[in-house]
Amino acid sequence: MTVPTDAAGHGRGIDVDALLLVSFGGPEGPEDVLPFLRNVTRGRGVPEARLAEVAAHYDRFGGRSPINDQNRALLASLRERLAPMPVYWGNRNWQPYLADAVARMRADGVRRAACFVTSAFASYSGCRQYREDLAAALEQVGPGAPDLVKLRLFFDHPGFVEPMVDHCVRALATLPVAVRDEARLVFTAHALPRSQAAASGPDGGAYERQLRAAAGVIAQRVAACVGTRHEWQVAYCSRSGPPSVPWLEPDVNDALAALADGGARAAVIVPVGFVSDHMEVVYDLDVEAVRTASERGLAVARAGTVGTDPRFVAMVADLVAERRSPEWERPALSGEGPSHDVCPLHCCDPGARRPAAAGVPADLCAHGPARSGVTASQPGRPANAERSRHGEPRNEATILVDERAGTSRSDSHPAGE
C-alpha cells in the first residue's frame, strides 16, 4: 500500500471503509489469567511462580480485567457514532485477537481500515509495537487482508484534554476544603526504560515531551475552571524489570511520599497516560498509590479517565475524518501537536527492526530477525506469538521481567492494558 503523505507526515485524502479499535486485551475470568500472562511474557523465561504472584493482583478483582468491558463500551459508542461505517475490535494479548479482527474484516469485504490505538503518546510499546502486531496479523491472514492506516496520536486533542480537565476539577472537589486549593496535580503515565523513552517518536524523546505538553495544557485549563493555579508534575507507575535498567522517574509512590515530606497536604492523581480504568489504574493507583498517600497523611483523590466520554468518542470520529479529507481541521492544544498521520521509517523503533504495518511502506519490509512459523489463530494465542521465539532482542519494557518477588508493583504492561 502506498499512503500519500506530505513533508510533515500527513496522510490525507485516504478512503477508509472501517475502523479497527486496537488494544492490549485482558483476562475475562480466573481461568484466563495465567494463559493471558503467558501470552504477554511468551519467550522471556518468566517462571510460573512469578506469573502466579502477578495473577494474585487480578484475584482482587475476581480474576477479570476491567479493560475488556471498557473496550466493549467504547466499541458500542463508536459504532453508534460512526454508523454506517463498521467498527471492529482486536487485541494484542487476548481475545478478540488482532488477526481474528483482520480476518473478519476480510470476510466482510473491508478494503482499508483506519486503526485507533488506545494509547495517546509516542513510544515503542504504545505505538510501534501495535504496528508490529498489525503486521503479524496481516501476514497471518494472508491475501485479501485489508490495507491498514493508523490514526494519529491524540495526546493534546481537545477531545482528550477537555474530559481530563473535567475529571481533575471533579477530583479536586472531593478533597477537604481546607487543603483543596493547595493540592498538587500528579500526572501519571506508564514508566518506560529510559532507552525506550529516548527512542520515542521520529526524533527521540517524544514520550516525555508529549506527557509534559498534555499535563501543562490540562493544568492550565483546570486553573481557569477553579480559579486557582495548582502546581503539577509528571510521575510514572507500573515499572517492572531489573534494577540495573534505568527507567523514567519518579515513581508515583516516591513522588507522593516526597510531596508529603515536603509539607504538601493534598494531591490529585491524574492518570493522563491511560484512557480507561484498567488494571494499572485500579490497582497501581487506586490501591498502591492511594495507600502510599494515606500512610503519609496526604489527602488524595484520583481523577477519572476519558473512557466513553462523548467528546472522546467524537474525537475518534474526527480523527477518521482527518484521514479521509485533506480539508478537515487538525486541532491541537499544545506546541507538540498535531502529531503526524503516517509514522516515519523506524519511528519509535528501539533497534529490533521488525516489520510494522500502518506506516510508510518501507517499514513493512523485514529488517531484523525472521518471523517464521506464524500460523492460524489459536485460542489463547496471539498472532505474534511466534515472534519472541526467534532470538529477538529482549524488550526490557515488557512486564514481569523482574523475577524477584514483590519488586514489581503490578502486572506492569508497558503501554497500559
Feature locations, PLM:
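Active-site-proximal alpha-helix that buttresses catalytic centers in soluble enzyme cores
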Residues: 2-375, 400, 417
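Targeting/processing segments of secretory and organellar proteins
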Residues: 375, 396-397, 405-406
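Intrinsic disorder/low-complexity segments
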Residues: 378-380, 384, 405
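Short, intrinsically disordered C-terminal tails of secreted or membrane-associated proteins
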Residues: 407-416
